[in-house]
Amino acid sequence: MAKQLIYSDEARKAMKSGVDKLANAVKITLGPKGRYVVLDKKFGAPTITNDGVTIAKEIELEDPFENMGAQLVKEVASKTNDIAGDGTTTATVLAQSLINEGLKNITAGANANHIKKGIEKAVAAAIDEIKKIAKQVKNKGEIAQIASISASDKEIGNLIADAMEKVGKDGVITVEEGKSSETTLDVVEGMQFDRGYSSHYFVTDTERMQAILEDPYIIITDKKISSMQEILPLLEKIIQTGKSFMIIAEDIEGEALATLVLNKIRGTLKVIAVKAPGFGDRRKEMLQDIAILTGGTVITEETGLKLDKATIDLLGQAKRIVVDKENTTIVSGLGDKKEIEARIAQIRKQIEDTKSDYDKEKLQERLAKLVGGVAVVNVGAATEVEMKTKKFKVEDALNATRAGVEEGIVAGGGVALLKTQTVLEKINAADSDEKTGIEIVLKALEGPIRMIIENAGLEASVVVDKVKNSKDTAFGYDADNNEYVDMIKAGIVDPAKVTRTALENAASIASLILTTETLVTDIPEKSPKFPGGGGMPPMPEY
């Protein structure tokens, strides 16, 4: 395949054009008065969103050289979203400013690699300062503030704060499309896994179609149970205690299932049978989680334990079990607290060590089940288009909140970035080009606050100067209410992790673009013209 190449200023100019096209589409969404972008879809209604990464992902430019620039800035938004879950628009604004200012100086003859060194020095100093000024999140009110600012909606902020309070910072909070126009929160306490009863004959509450047991024993095994003889000795021991019980096994079928159902209908046994959750190695780990949570032992031949020889002390216990057609919930397992804490610590370590996003997600789900429970935010709206828009907001707010809890919060509205300028002014540069790199970062740090104010329809320069000259690190401008305030006290905050990640990723991609000298891409193929269609020959003239 033949290639086309462009060099030096021409290459950088093409990339800059692509960067600007993407960034200009994204940055209008920044701040409380930012606007929306409508994304056309080949099928169905268009998507209306103010989520930076969602907009960036949709943009592909016709010119291949311009598209390279756009795709690199898209990478800034995607990486920031992957790490921090929010701050994608801020990252894009920072990247555009760093690239534009850097290219001006390189075109004027500055050394690109020395500028890069200056940018790296300045960004490292700014990030250290962000970490220093970060304030730890201590209460539900501060959690609500983070979520409210991210979503530009106090109702969503309060809902996420409620969810986090109920399931803890490690708990699973999922966002789903609701069935009404109201946004609601459902919390499932205890451990829940996605396996329902093996037969509807186990149901005890016919109105809700749920099977409920109080203070039951729990048999946990990785075996497939088909013969009643395998579990009969253990059942006789349980019957003597007068307690109800649940069986969690790979499968319960044939004679064993029929006998359990028959005895349940007759009232001889209070029993529920469910299949074990997960598959393969993950199933083994989940059964072990259930065993530790309930104080039981997984009955498996791998450890030399057999069902027909099992004793009562191998069984788990819980205060309550609720099983419906699709899910099983174990409430208040009676496991040893120290063992549960050790298991939690082990899973946390695995989360840190794993490099697979899928494995990390599954480990976090397991952690949440052990720690506290699962909260579901059901997003409600009048139309499907509005629901999708609102769902993006809730997901961003949830990610921002988690980031805030993790690394603390800083003054929002672009103020934290602006205030780090004082640290950058003290950096010693090796030469004039490195100093230029530091000055490029100094100017870029004003980008987000300028954009927020411009999107609110105001003149940015006056506001930026006033905020910059104040010695109070929390002093800033509330663009929503058009007034100067203490940003922390006013609840206008950003997660430190989001601010830090946005700056790191913007600087990383900007440095790559600034040190680029050649662009190589395929020569676009010209599609052949279709030959003219057949038809009648021309009629003779008379």
UniProtKB/Swiss-Prot annotation:
It catalyses: ATP + H2O + a folded polypeptide = ADP + phosphate + an unfolded polypeptide. Gene3D superfamilies: GroEL, GroEL-like equatorial domain, TCP-1-like chaperonin intermediate domain. It comes from the Bacteria. Keywords: ATP-binding, Chaperone, Cytoplasm, Isomerase, Nucleotide-binding. Pfam families: Cpn60_TCP1 (PF00118). It is found in: Cytoplasm. One of its GO terms (cellular component) is cytoplasm. ATP binds at residues 29-32, 86-90, 413, 494. GO terms for biological process: protein refolding. InterPro entries: Cpn60/GroEL, Cpn60/GroEL/TCP-1, GroEL-like_apical_dom_sf, GROEL-like_equatorial_sf, TCP-1-like_intermed_sf. One of its GO terms (molecular function) is ATP binding. Its EC number is 5.6.1.7. Belongs to the chaperonin (HSP60) family. PANTHER family: 60 KDA HEAT SHOCK PROTEIN, MITOCHONDRIAL. Together with its co-chaperonin GroES, plays an essential role in assisting protein folding. The GroEL-GroES system forms a nano-cage that allows encapsulation of the non-native substrate proteins and provides a physical environment optimized to promote and accelerate protein folding. Forms a cylinder of 14 subunits composed of two heptameric rings stacked back-to-back. Interacts with the co-chaperonin GroES. This is Chaperonin GroEL. It comes from Endomicrobium trichonymphae.
